[in-house]
């Protein structure tokens, strides 16, 4: 009997705990959902104000500072989707996805993670007190300052801390690069470029969400979705103004033509494409028509060839690491360029383009280069590498 009584008591306590859990769950969740709905409505009004260029409506949703910073950006879409809300006291923290499209350039949205802090006013209305990139997410250009916009014939340049005149020089470079790339690659691409010019190397690194040391000495990079589908946002050419400012006129144009080549070839570049081919081809287009010889354009590789002979093989993807040895990185780019230059000279420019596309069509790395070399160039990777090593000896030895 005693044991039976203890069992009954335990069950009663368990039932009470269960009811308490259910009551807390039923009472707490709707409250959080209600806050989430209200926060979403505030962000919907904020997004509508951005698209309508309505400064007063934007200010009515909270902190007005962000409006002036992005006012000049030509936007086709701007929206938020709340993913989490954490109420606390008289305020709340929220996580959201910001999706936007630049008018005339983005076919699909760019989506970035944002962190928001909200407060309630005396009437109980929610207001945005602060908005910033979520942890691990890059700082957008307008997070870094007021964006200035310059349009070119084939380009849209967005910059921070730069005058219209300074940004016009980047637009001119891009406007010359687009037709140069089309003459080499063809016209089956967007034939327009979005260029982002932050104030400094630190701004570039913040935009890309990486340490500044990763891009020191790198004049520009191109960001985009691998494969570049029909609904992909436009690639961005992101400039490192510190390194870019050290280049001469020819070097600046080569860099812009190189980066624009990445934009043009995006749809044919994927996991199957080795970096020696994608970077080498971009350099080949960049140097095309400049008259620069291998001795002039490949000084680090020339030094290596004259000191130790040609490398044993084509550059690996690991050789292209930005954070590694600068001389090794330079040799990798120069090695890729000379390989593509050799294909263009010995097989022809048409075959170089066909080879690039054939590698991408394979879809995955194993066998991609080997099969494309056999089907397009009629050679093997082993024989091609031997020819390239002799080519380096002849051109740089």
Regions found by a protein language model. Give the residues of each.
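Secretory targeting and sorting signals
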Residues: 2-28
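Juxtacatalytic substrate-recognition/specificity segment
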Residues: 151-274, 365-368
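Surface-exposed, charged secondary-structure patches
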Residues: 70-115, 243-245
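Short beta-strand edge/turn micro-motifs at domain boundaries
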Residues: 104-146
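Solvent-exposed, polar/charged alpha-helical surfaces in well-ordered, non-transmembrane soluble domains
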Residues: 37-44, 48, 56-60, 172-179, ...
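Short solvent-exposed beta->alpha transition segments
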Residues: 30-34, 40, 44-91
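A short, structured loop/turn motif at beta-sheet edges
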Residues: 86-92, 119-124, 345-349
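Acidic/His/Gly-enriched intrinsically disordered linker/tail segments
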Residues: 223-230, 250-251, 269-397
């Amino acid at each position: 009997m005693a044991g039976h009584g203890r069992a009954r008591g335990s069950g009663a306590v368990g039932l009470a705990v269960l009811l308490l859990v259910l009551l807390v769950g039923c009472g707490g969740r709707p409250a959080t959902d209600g806050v989430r709905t209200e926060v979403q409505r505030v962000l919907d009004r904020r997004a509508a104000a951005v698209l309508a260029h309505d400064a007063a409506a934007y200010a009515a949703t909270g902190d007005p500072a962000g409006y002036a910073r992005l006012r000049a950006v030509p936007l086709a879409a701007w929206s938020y989707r709340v993913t989490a809300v954490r109420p606390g006291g008289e305020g709340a923290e929220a996580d959201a996805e910001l999706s936007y499209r630049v008018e005339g350039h983005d076919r699909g949205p760019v989506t970035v993670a944002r962190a928001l802090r909200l407060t309630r006013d005396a009437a109980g209305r929610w207001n945005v007190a602060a908005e910033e990139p979520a942890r691990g997410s890059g700082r957008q250009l307008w997070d870094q300052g007021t964006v200035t916009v310059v349009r070119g014939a084939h380009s849209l340049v967005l910059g921070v801390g730069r005058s219209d005149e300074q940004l016009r020089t980047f637009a001119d470079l891009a406007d010359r690069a687009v037709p140069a790339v089309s003459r080499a690659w063809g016209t089956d691409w967007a034939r327009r470029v979005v260029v982002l010019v932050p104030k400094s190397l630190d701004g570039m690194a913040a935009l890309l969400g990486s340490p500044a040391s990763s891009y020191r000495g790198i004049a520009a990079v191109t960001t985009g979705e691998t494969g570049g589908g029909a609904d992909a946002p436009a690639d961005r050419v992101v400039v490192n103004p510190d390194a870019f400012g050290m280049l001469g006129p020819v070097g600046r144009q080569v860099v812009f033509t190189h980066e624009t080549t990445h934009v043009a070839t995006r749809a044919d570049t994927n996991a199957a494409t080795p970096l020696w081919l994608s970077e080498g081809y971009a350099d080949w287009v960049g140097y095309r028509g400049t008259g620069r010889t291998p001795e002039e354009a490949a000084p680090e590789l020339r030094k290596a060839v004259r000191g130790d002979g040609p490398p044993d093989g084509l550059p690996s993807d690991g050789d292209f690491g930005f954070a590694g040895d600068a001389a090794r990185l330079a040799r990798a780019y120069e090695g890729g360029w000379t390989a593509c230059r050799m294909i263009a000279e010995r097989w022809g420019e048409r075959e170089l383009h066909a080879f690039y596309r054939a590698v991408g069509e394979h879809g995955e790395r194993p066998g991609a280069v080997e099969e494309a070399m056999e089907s397009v160039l009629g050679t093997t990777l082993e024989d091609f590498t031997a020819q390239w090593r002799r080519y380096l000896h002849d051109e740089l030895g």
